[in-house]
Every structure is written in C-alpha cells, then in structure tokens.
Design a protein with these regions (language model features):
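C-terminal, active-site-flanking charged/polar segments
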Residues: 44, 75-77, 95-97, 217-229
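A glycine-rich, often tryptophan-bearing local segment used as a flexible ligand/cofactor-contacting loop or short
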Residues: 55-140
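Metal-dependent peptidase/peptidase-like ectodomains
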Residues: 127-164
Length: 230
C-alpha cells in the first residue's frame, strides 16, 4: 500500500515465496477492513517511508480490527519504522531518541548535518540468548545484524526479555554517528508484546536484506513458527 517500502516488502516476499516455498497473501493496508483476518496466523508490516500517509492517523488501517485480530490469537510482526506505528496505535513502546542540536552549523551545511545522523546500512554484532525461541537454530552466541534504520527500542528491565542485544563495540562494518552508536549500545532490536491470546513481535533491524543476508533469515522464520511459545 501507499508508504510501504517496496524493497522491504519484496525482500520478505522473496524469502518466503521463492526460497522457502511458503505461500503468502499480499494485502494493501487500505483494504484490510474488507478482509477476514482470522484466516491468517501472522500479519507482517514491512518498513514504511517516514512522513507517508501510512504513518499518520493509523495509515488507513482499521486499528480496532488489528487489535481484535491480535487479542483473538493473531500475531503481528512489525519491522523498522512500523515499530513506531505499533507504538502510536496499538501498544506504547519506549524509544531512545537522538536529541543532538546543531552547533556552529550554518544554513548551507544543514543537509550534511542531518545526513550524518542517518544510518543508511551498517553491520552490528549482537549477543543472543540461544534458549529463546527467536534464536532457535542459531549455533553461535553472536549474530551480525544488518541495520538501516534509526529506531532504538529500550531494553526490558527483565534480562530474559532481551534475547538479542548489541555486543560491546558492536560496529562491524559501515557508518553510524557517535550519537546514534551510543543509543544503539543501550537498545534492543527485538521485543515481544503479549496482547490477549496473540502477540506483537517487533524488529528494528533488517533480517532479510536483499536476498543475500541469510544469517538472520531464521529470525523471521522463528517469529512465524515459534511465536506461540515466545
């Protein structure tokens, strides 16, 4: 639908339909009100463009319909900026935010100033709890993650609710500003929110990047097949 990033939607589609032969339904967010969602075990919200209609006023999505779907046992998976949509419409989430102010930056340099705070694509190391269902099948205690967003969720106070955390000195490749790196180090890329009989599963990093970042594909599959025990 309008505002959904086609790259992200296509990456998810390719992974499930082409690589794993799992049939999916591609639904326009504006058409959900006309669809019986009880047919589906999971709904996946890909990333969206900030400032799009998808971000505002529920983005044309019938929010009550989604709430009822989850409470009755459905599962919602939200990626990257869609995590913000969940926070605005379904369940409040705490975020760390970059509050940097321009100091000695003139008007002609403003685009470079803001551009330096964007994380266009970088690789970060994470430490995982292999006993948690989100990490089933991963043999190492560490998992490199591909990140191209500036969404930083706060960690849970209960350590067992943080099955994926960034390691110390997490930057492995790419660029991130010092300000955002400090936020990343105290954030978690994954959360589970329980609501009624269902769950909301949140992921701020891209587990399916361009059909070659295979190491984290298992994260999405575990959200699909093991959400009932998370």
């Amino acid at each position: 639908g309008e505002g959904v990033r086609s790259y992200d939607a296509g990456e998810i589609w390719h992974l499930l339909d082409t690589r794993y032969k799992i049939p999916i339904s591609k639904l326009d967010v504006g058409d959900l009100s006309y669809i019986d969602l009880s047919r589906y075990s999971h709904i996946i919200l890909p990333d969206y463009s900030e400032g799009s209609q998808y971000q505002a006023d529920g983005g044309g999505i019938n929010v009550d319909q989604i709430k009822n779907y989850i409470k009755n046992g459905g599962n919602l998976i939200a990626y990257r900026n869609s995590v913000k949509w969940v926070s605005n419409n379904l369940s409040e989430i705490e975020f760390h935010t970059n509050e940097i102010n321009a100091d000695n930056v003139n008007f002609s340099e403003r685009q470079n100033f803001y551009g330096a705070q964007q994380t266009g694509g970088a690789i970060f190391n994470s430490k995982i709890d292999k006993s948690h269902p989100i990490n089933y099948g991963i043999e190492s205690n560490y998992l490199p993650l591909f990140r191209n967003s500036n969404v930083y969720m706060t960690k849970s106070k209960q350590s067992f609710n943080n099955p994926i955390v960034y390691s110390s000195n997490p930057l492995m490749s790419g660029y991130i500003s010092e300000e955002n790196l400090s936020l990343l180090e105290i954030s978690t890329p994954f959360k589970v929110i329980r609501s009624g009989k269902g769950k909301i599963l949140l992921m701020t990093d891209n587990t399916n990047f361009r059909a070659f970042w295979f190491g984290t594909n298992r994260i999405l599959l575990n959200m699909l097949f093991h959400s009932n025990i998370m």
